[in-house]
From Swiss-Prot:
InterPro entries: Ribosomal_uS11, Ribosomal_uS11_bac-type, Ribosomal_uS11_CS, Ribosomal_uS11_sf
Protein name: Small ribosomal subunit protein uS11
Chain positions covered by the region annotation Disordered: 111-130
Pfam family, one: Ribosomal_S11
Lineage of producing organism: Bacteria, Bacillati, Bacillota, Bacilli, Lactobacillales
Role noted for this protein: Located on the platform of the 30S subunit, it bridges several disparate RNA helices of the 16S rRNA. Forms part of the Shine-Dalgarno cleft in the 70S ribosome.
Gene Ontology terms describing biological process: translation
Xref: PANTHER family: 40S RIBOSOMAL PROTEIN S14/30S RIBOSOMAL PROTEIN S11
Subunit architecture: Part of the 30S ribosomal subunit. Interacts with proteins S7 and S18. Binds to IF-3.
Family: Belongs to the universal ribosomal protein uS11 family.
Gene name for this UniProt entry: rpsK
Native organism: Lactobacillus acidophilus (strain ATCC 700396 / NCK56 / N2 / NCFM)
NCBIfam families from the UniProt entry: PRK05309.1, uS11_bact
Amino acid sequence: MMPAKKTARKRRVKKHVESGVAHIHSTFNNTLVMITDVQGNAVAWSSAGALGFKGSRKSTPFAAQMAAEAAAKSAMDQGMKHVEVSVKGPGAGRESAIRSLQATGLEITAIRDVTPVPHNGSRPPKRRRA
């Protein structure tokens, strides 16, 4: 039997991108932050779960803040300076993620809400009693 071939993982190429789009997807359970170039190719991403937050802590504004900070730092290492922000979803981490992006030093040029709104599609889940 032949020994298993080691497949070398492709090294991540540092892209030098000046401006891009920060996609913030904030759900009731988690917040995902992905920073892409203008064409939509991923430059950096992070999420509350990827940073080690588990369970109900993932859905907090603080977790969203940390996720946005981590993604922004990674993008700034690759030369990112200006971002447009597109926010999707009803979660708690929307505003804190935007503030965190600004605090890390990225210049925010525009903020868009791209939350999909159904034209009376499928029935929503039952109302939350919180």
